[in-house]
Amino acid sequence: MNFKYIVAVSFLITSGYARSVKNDEQSLSQRDVLEEESLREIRGIGGALLSAGKAALKGLAKGFAEHFGKRTAEDHEVMKRLEAVMRDLDSLDHPEEASERETRGFNQEEIANLFTKKEKRILGPVLSLVGSALGGLIKKIG
């Protein structure tokens, strides 16, 4: 009788532990899915902000070009830099196409780190270039 009781209790403990492990695995996979969804949302918001900023810069550059008509060599250089910045921003809108060759063998975490590094590497100079270009144009207006 004691042996049957010990076997039954052992079986109950084992099945309870197995259910616990299974629930832990499910909660971890659900947490991973939620983290991935939140990262997509954050990148989507960032992409929308970049698109809006890009459209504003294009409109501003076009407005300045129409307003001032002829450009000096310095203005021409600034506009060329702004156009290069716009191309860089376009590549950020479609990171899968732009960095597809670079990221073929990497895992997801390395891809996310690479994308973040590219954003930082491009956005820093872009913001300083845009700031200096706008500052120069505002000085000429004023």
Swiss-Prot record:
Propeptide residues according to the Swiss-Prot or TrEMBL record: 19-43, 72-121
Annotated InterPro entries: Bombinin (IPR007962)
Gene Ontology cellular component annotations, sorted alphabetically: extracellular region
Main location per the UniProt record: secreted
Positions bearing Phenylalanine amide: 68
Localization (cell): Secreted
Function description: Maximin-y shows antimicrobial activity against bacteria and against the fungus C.albicans. It has little hemolytic activity.
Protein name in UniProt: Maximins y/Hv type 2
Source taxonomy: Eukaryota, Metazoa, Chordata, Craniata, Vertebrata
